[in-house]
Structure formats: C-alpha cells, structure tokens
C-alpha cells in the first residue's frame, strides 16, 4: 500500500489546481485564513472522494439508501482509505435523542438493567424476588429460636364484604385459627364483619419456634400456605403482632400488593418503545400545555383593549362571552387584567366549572338571544380547537401559546413506573443518567456485584466504562447522559461523535475533522489532542482543519493554505513540519507561530465605572449556584471558564433572554434569577450567534444584510428599467415577474437519480442566471443583476463605492473579514463562523446609539490568528463608540485584550457554576485557582501579572470589591 495520499489537480471551489502529497497514518493539520479553501480541500475533495469511492463499491440496491457525494473537481487522487467525516453540525433535532443514545451507552445500560437489575415494588419498595420453599425455610431458621412465630397465608386482601363463605371454606379445610384485620381469632369465634368496610383475612397455617428439627414440617407448611395464599405467605411473631412481618413470595411479585413484572427486557428501559416509555409524555419527559403567561400577552391592558388576543372588542363572538361573564361576576371589562381578582382571572382562563351563566348572543338578524350554560374557559377553548382542527395554519397559530413543562408522571425521566423502580447497586437507571459523566464513570469503576449478577455484568460494565472514559478524554466529563442532543453546541456534538469513533476502534480509516477544539477550554485541549493521536496510533490517517496553536504544534504534518481568502486563497503557502512552516516566508500562520507577528495586548485598558454597572443577582439556572453577575457598561467583557462551567446558562439563557424581553419586547423563557438592575443603561440588546442566516439556498449575504433591497432599487432607477416600467420587485428571484419561471429563480433544476446522488443541472432556459432575458438586459455600469450577485464583496465595493446605502453594508462585511464572500452565495454553504460574522456585519451597518448591549458566543470559531486580529478591531470599535460588548470565549488572544474578564468555575457541571474571579486579565492571571488564569499568565508580561494590571493595585482591589459579589 502507498505511504502517501497523492492529490493532483484539485480545483474544488477556490482551490487553484493543487498538486500535493500527504503522508498516511499521521496527524495532519490544515490551517489558513477563514475562506482560504481548507474545508474545500479536506471535506469537499479528500473526504468526498474517499466516501464516494467506498459507496460506489456497494451494490446499486445498497447505494439507493445512502447519500452519495458529488464527485469533486480533481484530476486524480490515490492512496485513499474509507473516509469518516466528523463535522461541527448539531447531532440531531429529534427530541428523543440524548447523549446516552447517540453514544450508544444507553443501549448498554438498558442491557445491564435488564440482565442484573433488581426490580422493586413502587409502593412498598420490596424486592420482586421469586423464592423457593427451601429458601423460605432457610430464612425462617435464621430467626430467634426463643421467639414463637406463626405462618400465615393471605386469603382476602383489602376487600369489602362479610366474607362468610371464606370462613366456611377455611373451616371445611381444617383450619382452626384466622387473623382478621390484624387480630387473631378461633375460626368459630370470628365476629360478623362490617359489609362496607375493607378487610384482610389470613389463615394461620402453623405455629412454631424456629429449630433445625422442624425443617420438614416447615417445608410442608409453606407449601400449604403458598397454595392457599396464591404464592404468598408471611411469618409473624405470636407475642408482639406489631413487629414487621417477614414476607415471602413464590411468584415474581410484591408480597404485600401482588405487584408483579414480566421478565425484564432491554425494551422495558427504552423511552422510545411503548413497553418502557412513560404513558403520560410518551417518553419525551415533557408535556405540552397552553401557558396562561403566553395566552395573556398584555397583562397591563384590559380585556376589552386586548389583554388576550382574539377575545377583545374586535372579535364580536368571543367578546360577547366576556361581556356576559363580566355582568355575572360584576367585574369591569375595561379594568386592566392585572387589577382583576385572582378568582375572576382563573374563571376567565379555565372556565366556570359547574356554575351556569346567562349568556347573551347576537343573532344574524341583529337581535339578541339568551342561553344559560357553563363557561368553557379560554385555555380549554384553545385546547379543544387545537385538538379538533384539521388546518395546519390554525394549529401553527395556536402553537404560539404552547409551553412545555416537566412531565408530572415521570418527573422528566421519560420511563414508566416499572422501569423507574429497577435497581443496580441501589441506583435506578434515571438516577444514573442524571449524573455528570465523570461521576457515572466513578460509579462503574467502584461497582461490585456478587454471584451470577457479577459474572453477567462484568462485560457490560467494561463496555460502558470504556465509552464513558472516551467522553471524559474529549473534555465532556460535565455532560449528563440524559442531556438532549439538540441542546449541544456544534463543538460538543462533534466531540461526542469523535468519542464514539474511538470506541469503534477502526483501523486503516481516514478521519476528517472540523475544528474539534471549538468550545473547549485550554485545560481540556491536551486530552483532546491525546485522543487524536490515539486515533492515529491505531493506524488511521487523521486530517484536522484547525486554528488552535496547540493542535498545529502537535501535528505530524502541517498544510497552510492561503495566502488570502476566497479568490485570493486556494494555494499552498507552506507544508511540512512545524519548523518548516515557521520558516516559510509566505506562511501567515508561520509568522504568528514564530512570534514575528502577534496580537498585541492593549497599552491601556478601559477602567470600569462603578456607578454604571449591570447587576444580575441570584442566577441559578442549570448548574449556577446563585451567581451575582456585574457587567461594566461601555467595556469589552470576556466571560471565561472551563467547558460546562455555566457560561452559556448565565449569559445566553439568563442575561440575554432577560434583556431581550425587557428591552426588545421579546418573549424568551428565562432561566431562574432573583433580580436585575441596570438594564435602563441600554436601548437595544443584540445576540450574535452561529445559527444559520437562512435555511434555504435562496438566502444569501445580500438578502440577510438588507443590501439586496437598495440593489434592486438601484437597478429599477436605471434609465432603461424606468423606460420599461420595471419596479424593484422585477429584480427579485423570489417572486414572479423578473425571475426565470422554468427554475423559479433557483438557477438549477434538481434531477432525482435514485441510487446515484441527485444531480442539480443548470436551468437550460436561464443557464443558471435565475432571471429571464428581459431582466438581464438591464445593466448598471455594464453589469446586470446576476453579475452583481456573482461578485465578491471586495469587487462589489469598488463598483458601488458611490452608493452609500450599499457601500456601508459592503464595508462592514470587509471589516469582519468576509471580503471573499459572493453577494449571492447560498446561506446553506456558509460555516457557523461565517454566518456569525455576516450577522455582526449587519449590526455594524446599522446606526447605533452607543447604548447597545452586544452578546457574542465564541466569535473566533473558524478564525485564523489574522482574522481574530481583524475581529478584535471591530469589537474594540463597538466598545469605543460607547457600546457594551460581552463575549463568551476560550481564545486567549481575545481574553488578553479584554477590559474586564469574568471567570466561572472552578470545574464543569455540578462542580462549576460560581464566579471565581472578576477583574482585568492581569487579575484573573494572578488568581491561584483559575484554570483560565493559569494559561493567561503565560501570555501576559510577568510584571503585569504580579502587579495585577497597569493601575495601582489598591485601585484595582477597590473596583473589584465594588464590582464582584
């Protein structure tokens, strides 16, 4: 087998006919500017060809079930292995997917509980064990031989009646004593029982002192008792009947209530199977309900003015119901909802119960008619309409008022009562899945089961332990197995898939990864790199697209693509060892690695104003422990901490949702907190995340940034367009008129090929240009609308520099490092980092008041050192205009340039959720228990760290005292 992967003539996207050789079975890092062509080489060329060749080796029948990748634009590749791609895409949007299910650990847990689990009665907590007569006798012989005992057989349990027939049958069978409701009687002296009261009747089978010489007699007595008691028997002291009885069962059931289970199966522990799922929530762990907080959208308004949408004066039918209610209960329909008595509000929302109310209805003829009936209530009315409607539009409209809450039946565990009451080492399956992975691993390391259970469990526990260990190795020890897959970040999802691949133990495979270090603290980086080298050492080729300095330094082979982005990239600037990259004059990466270029620390940090602070008190969502957060206004603040320490919960789920609801009038669910103060300092809050800017190929940077509207207006003002009477709508590819109707403005026609990949061919009418011939005849400075959409931002800026409405938006795209993007590039082809920067550009192009609160979550994703430098300039520009910028970030180059750093920790999950230190980067670097500070100290001048910053240490402490809780 060849020792090299030979690539000849790679021209995918912006690659410029690359010829290169990559060593197999090594760790290869591909780096370079954002948009330089790294992903085009790694994913769209190497991975695509490896995957395509493997799939094409399968039968035509098998191929129709697999998505076959498009053949990359390359002359020749040899030395490829079957390829596995691990990208930064959210794992699943299925609400049933959890960390446990996607790693398959949950499958092993189900098997473990089915094979060695100990079921217990949910009511009485007795183990459900079937015992033999010998086991029962042996147990009785261990009791106190000085005590007198009686053996009882339950005949009637908690049933109403006089039960005269039961006593007659017992008498006929020769029994002389019975116990009725806990009292002993001779069978002929039993009092008449109360007919309407529940009774328990037990036959006394034998009375004895436990001694070895009565073993045979006891065995016969037990057989009689079990036959009479339908498999149940109990032993009770004769002298003190208040003592706890010893219960026995020959069936797999509870000796008290006869609760039983069939044989345990793995399906019983699956929340995706009817056998195991909670019947109330169908295994989802949450139930949907119409939320009064969403139904009453304006509690400050009156019912007549629109407190509840659709039940005000504008809707005659529903308003006449409210008017009749007001008359019956004597409340004012013009009074605000908040001022109405609680019982009145409850009646309006949930109905009048059994109380009949006189309602006045308007007839079609304009008259009035009266009817007396109960009031249904607004919430039950919505529930009924949601249930009965067949209209998707009505259902979608009503869904706006629906919220979810933890299922009251299963408490969010998703499993039914039987599955929730099976134990291994005194822990149920739901109790295990809520443990952080680190703690779960510790549980299995110390798990000791005796006898046959231990023999069966040993192999299953080994598999579970290995898989949990892999998750710990990739820095995910803070996650829980019940965590929903759709709540994971892209980086977490990618590392979970990476852990699964290590678990698979494949050899001779080519792995292609996209920035696995995203969302990972520097402390966990070493473990991740250890994981990658372990994959390599198994005999695999590991190709990583990465910007992290540690990863680049640890690579066996480095490939630097550039020199610029987009059309200015696609070339190999340098390749080889770390030393070769650092020495290469054309390598921008080498310049940063060697220290010839660096991101500078600001000469002067902006001090916080203790009188202008945003104070958030008592934040306790997820793992936060009553955190008190203080954000200085008008500064660039970094939120740091190890993965899972609570950064996203504190900023995204608490601060942003709270500020957006208060300032922007949004209605996001807010994580729990005590109080907030200082929101009046801001007039707008903007969250810039990495979600896509559009989910269809029709979305693009021009439409998202709002540039397409002035563009279309400009083309409509061209003399030829005015002469033809064309409006701006003529130049939209989304509506009829100017677009090509053959492809409906897509420019491509989809041809389904069944077992081959779907083929998208250029429309043969417009030849991929989206517009009809008449529209394309309109030109501005020699370019038609399609030519403009095909331009890069950089070229378009030269063309439109005299048009302020367009130029301003183009300039901000250049500022955030997206000069290489095409204006009409499909939003679905943008990476998460590119999408985030398009959003940032849109915000920058708006006129800001200098009182905006910007929140960014890991904006350096996908960014090279050079791109980070440009991004920091943009964020400092926002800060200098008076805005407040909050960034959740692990990148040390960003953290060291911040004005203020708030470090959470000390660890992830349950061992995190506290603010360790708040202050300048120098203050954080000097903190002895801060993981961030430990790594940050290496980048700051030693004198600064020891002095805790450029200011007087006393002044620093005073500010920190004011700011920090």
From Swiss-Prot:
Gene3D superfamilies: ABC transporter ATPase domain-like (1.10.8.280), ABC transporter ATPase like domain (1.20.1580.10), ATP-grasp fold, A domain (3.30.1490.20), P-loop containing nucleotide triphosphate hydrolases (3.40.50.300). The keyword Metal-binding applies. A zinc finger (C4-type) spans 254-281, 740-766. The lineage of its organism: Bacteria, Pseudomonadati, Pseudomonadota, Gammaproteobacteria, Lysobacterales. The keyword Iron-sulfur does not apply. Forms a heterotetramer with UvrB during the search for lesions. Belongs to the ABC transporter superfamily. UvrA family. This is UvrABC system protein A. One of its GO terms (molecular function) is zinc ion binding. It comes from the Bacteria. It comes from Xylella fastidiosa (strain Temecula1 / ATCC 700964). InterPro entries: ABC_transporter-like_ATP-bd, ABC_transporter-like_CS, ATP_grasp_subdomain_1, P-loop_NTPase, UvrA, UvrA_DNA-bd, UvrA_inter.
């Amino acid at each position: 087998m060849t020792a090299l992967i030979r690539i000849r003539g790679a021209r995918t996207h912006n690659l410029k006919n690359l010829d290169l050789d990559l060593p197999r079975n090594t760790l290869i890092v591909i780096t370079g500017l954002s948009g330089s062509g790294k992903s085009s080489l790694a994913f769209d060329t190497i991975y695509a060809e490896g995957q395509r060749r493997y799939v094409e080796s399968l039968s035509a029948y098998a191929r129709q079930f697999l998505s076959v990748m498009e053949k990359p634009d390359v002359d020749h590749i040899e030395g490829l292995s079957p390829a596995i791609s691990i990208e930064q895409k959210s794992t699943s949007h299925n609400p049933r997917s959890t960390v446990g299910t996607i790693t398959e650990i949950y499958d092993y847990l189900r098997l473990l509980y089915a094979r060695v689990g100990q079921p217990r009665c949910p009511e009485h907590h007795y183990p459900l064990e079937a015992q033999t007569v010998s086991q029962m006798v042996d147990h009785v012989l261990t009791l106190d031989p000085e005590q007198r005992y009686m053996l009882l057989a339950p005949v009637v349990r908690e049933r109403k009646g006089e039960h005269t027939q039961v006593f007659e049958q017992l008498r006929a069978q020769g029994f002389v004593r019975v116990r009725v409701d806990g009292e002993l009687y001779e069978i002929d002296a039993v009092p008449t029982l109360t007919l309407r009261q529940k009774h328990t009747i037990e036959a006394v089978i034998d009375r004895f002192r436990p001694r070895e010489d009565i073993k045979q007699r006891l065995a016969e007595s037990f057989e009689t008792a079990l036959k009479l008691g339908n498999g149940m028997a109990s032993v009770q002291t004769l002298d003190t009947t208040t003592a706890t009885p010893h219960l026995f069962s020959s069936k797999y059931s509870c000796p008290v209530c006869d609760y039983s289970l069939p044989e345990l199966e793995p399906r019983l522990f699956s929340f995706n199977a009817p056998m195991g799922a909670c019947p109330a929530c169908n295994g989802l762990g949450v139930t949907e309900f119409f939320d009064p907080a969403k139904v009453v959208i304006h509690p400050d308004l009156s019912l007549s003015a629109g407190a509840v949408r659709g039940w005000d004066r504008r809707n005659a039918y529903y308003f006449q119901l409210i008017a009749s209610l007001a008359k019956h209960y004597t409340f004012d329909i013009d009074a605000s909802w908040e001022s109405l008595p609680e019982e009145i509000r409850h009646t309006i929302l949930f109905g009048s119960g059994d109380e009949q109310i006189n309602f006045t209805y308007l007839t079609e003829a304009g008259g009035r008619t009266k009817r007396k009936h109960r009031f249904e209530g607004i919430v039950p009315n919505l529930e009924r309409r949601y249930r009965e409607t067949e209209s998707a539009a009505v259902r979608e409209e009503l869904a706006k008022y629906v919220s979810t809450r933890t299922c009251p039946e299963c408490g969010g565990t998703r499993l039914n009562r039987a599955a929730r009451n099976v134990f291994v080492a005194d822990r149920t399956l739901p109790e295990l899945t809520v443990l952080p992975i680190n703690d779960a691993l510790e549980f299995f390391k110390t798990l000791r089961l005796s006898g046959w259970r231990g023999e069966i469990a040993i192999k299953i526990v080994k598999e579970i332990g290995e898989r949990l260990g892999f998750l710990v190795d990739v820095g995910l020890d803070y996650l829980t197995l019940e965590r929903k897959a759709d709540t994971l970040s892209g980086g977490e999802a990618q590392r979970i898939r990476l852990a699964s691949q290590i678990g698979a133990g494949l050899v001779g495979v080519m792995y292609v990864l996209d920035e696995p270090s995203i969302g990972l603290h520097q402390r966990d980086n070493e473990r991740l790199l250890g994981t990658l080298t372990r994959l390599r050492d198994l005999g695999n080729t590991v190709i990583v697209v990465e910007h992290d300095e540690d990863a680049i330094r640890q690579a066996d082979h480095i490939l630097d693509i550039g020199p610029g982005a987009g059309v200015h990239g696609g070339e190999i600037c340098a390749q080889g060892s770390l030393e070769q990259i650092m020495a290469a004059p054309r390598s921008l990466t080498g310049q940063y690695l060697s220290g010839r270029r660096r991101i500078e620390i600001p000469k002067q940090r902006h001090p916080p104003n203790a009188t202008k602070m945003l104070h958030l008190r008592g934040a306790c969502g997820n793992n936060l422990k009553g955190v008190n957060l203080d954000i200085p206004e008008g500064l660039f603040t970094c939120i740091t901490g190890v993965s899972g320490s609570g950064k996203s919960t504190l900023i995204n789920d608490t601060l942003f949702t709270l500020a957006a609801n208060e300032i922007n009038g949004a209605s996001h669910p807010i994580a729990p907190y005590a109080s907030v103060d200082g929101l009046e300092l801001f007039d707008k809050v903007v969250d810039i995340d990495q979600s896509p800017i559009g989910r269809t190929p029709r979305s693009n940077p021009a439409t998202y940034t709002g540039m397409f509207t002035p563009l279309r207006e400009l083309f409509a003002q061209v003399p030829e367009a005015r002469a033809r009477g064309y409006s701006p709508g003529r130049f939209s590819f989304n509506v009829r008129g100017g677009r090509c109707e053959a492809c409906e403005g897509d420019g491509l026609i989809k041809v389904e090929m069944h077992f081959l990949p779907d083929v998208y061919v250029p429309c043969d009418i417009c030849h991929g240009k989206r517009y009809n011939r008449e529209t394309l005849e309109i030109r501005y400075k020699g370019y038609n609308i399609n030519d403009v959409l095909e331009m890069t931002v950089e070229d378009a800026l030269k063309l439109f520099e005299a048009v302020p409405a367009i130029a301003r938006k183009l300039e901000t795209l250049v500022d955030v490092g997206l000069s290489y993007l095409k204006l009409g590039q499909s939003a679905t082809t943008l990476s998460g980092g590119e999408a985030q920067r398009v959003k940032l550009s849109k915000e920058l192009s708006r006129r800001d008041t200098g009182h905006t609160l910007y929140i960014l979550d890991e904006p350096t994703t996908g960014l090279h050192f050079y791109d980070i430098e440009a991004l920091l300039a943009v964020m400092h520009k926002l800060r200098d205009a008076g805005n407040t910028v909050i960034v959740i970030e692990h990148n040390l180059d960003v953290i060291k340039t911040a004005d203020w750093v708030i470090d959470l920790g000390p660890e992830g999950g349950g061992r995190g959720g506290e603010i360790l230190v708040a202050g300048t980067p120098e203050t954080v670097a000097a903190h002895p228990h801060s993981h961030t500070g430990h790594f940050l100290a290496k980048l700051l001048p030693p004198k600064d760290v020891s002095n805790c910053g450029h200011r007087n240490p006393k002044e620093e402490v005073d500010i920190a005292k004011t700011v920090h809780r």
